[in-house]
């Protein structure tokens, strides 16, 4: 029975994919997995690719297990997707992992890489005291709910004027990620709502 299940999983993991997915979410979850050799339960990263196909339906493209999340491993995943027939991704929604955009563009040079806005907000709020988190979160909302990238840049400057003295790390963190933030503002509200977060992947873990 086990061999039959493993064969089925292997077939699923290597199945052919559609030639194009308008949106692909890429993220990693830290989960406890029992090691096959040591029989010990260890924390490992499960890498996930979740696609939204041309019919608007969500489809898990693959799951990969590794000891830690890293851009090098993501490159191998992108190559795996391409080898299975996925030729084009319009928008890749990712977390803030360093080197992630480069890994995606190595396999898909024309893909728009969009950072997960919610991930960036959560990272920002970690710099804040508990009592300030609500008001800082409201101020950050002025950035990502701006009408366009110019309005967003002004909102970021206004945020830094107001909060930069108390929390000097937040605005620079947004600026470092800015090239992967600004594609967001080119899309209509309906698309923004979809690509705002990689929570679609996190929900698979529940």
Set out the residue ranges of the language-model regions.
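A general structural motif at alpha-helix termini
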Residues: 1-2, 156
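RNase H-like nuclease fold core
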Residues: 2-94, 98, 102-110, 200
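Short, well-ordered secondary-structure micro-motifs
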Residues: 36, 104, 128, 184-185
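Short acidic, glycine/Ser/Thr-rich loop/turn "cap" segments at secondary-structure junctions
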Residues: 59-62, 83-88, 121, 137-144, ...
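Inter-helix linker motif
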Residues: 108-126
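Metal-dependent DNA phosphodiester-chemistry modules and their immediately adjacent helices/loops
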Residues: 124-154, 158
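Acidic/histidine-rich catalytic cores and adjacent linkers
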Residues: 145-206
């Amino acid at each position: 029975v086990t061999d039959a299940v493993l064969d089925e999983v292997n077939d699923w993991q290597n199945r052919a994919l559609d030639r194009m997915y308008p949106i692909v979410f890429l993220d990693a979850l830290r989960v406890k997995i029992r090691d096959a050799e040591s029989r010990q339960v260890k924390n490992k990263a499960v890498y996930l690719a979740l696609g939204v196909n041309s019919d608007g339906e969500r489809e898990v493209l693959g799951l990969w297990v590794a000891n830690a999340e890293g851009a090098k491993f993501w490159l191998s995943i992108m190559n795996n997707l391409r080898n299975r027939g996925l030729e084009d991704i319009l928008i890749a929604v990712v977390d803030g992992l360093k080197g992630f955009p480069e890994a995606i563009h190595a396999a898909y040079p024309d893909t728009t890489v969009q950072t997960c806005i919610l991930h960036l907000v959560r990272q920002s709020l970690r710099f804040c005291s508990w009592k300030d988190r609500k008001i800082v979160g409201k101020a950050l909302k002025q950035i990502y709910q701006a009408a366009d990238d110019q309005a967003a840049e002004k909102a970021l400057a206004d945020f830094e004027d107001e909060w930069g003295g108390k929390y000097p790390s937040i605005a620079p963190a947004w600026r470092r990620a800015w090239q992967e933030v600004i594609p967001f503002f080119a899309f209509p509200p309906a698309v923004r709502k979809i690509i705002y977060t990689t929570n679609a992947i996190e929900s698979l873990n529940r």
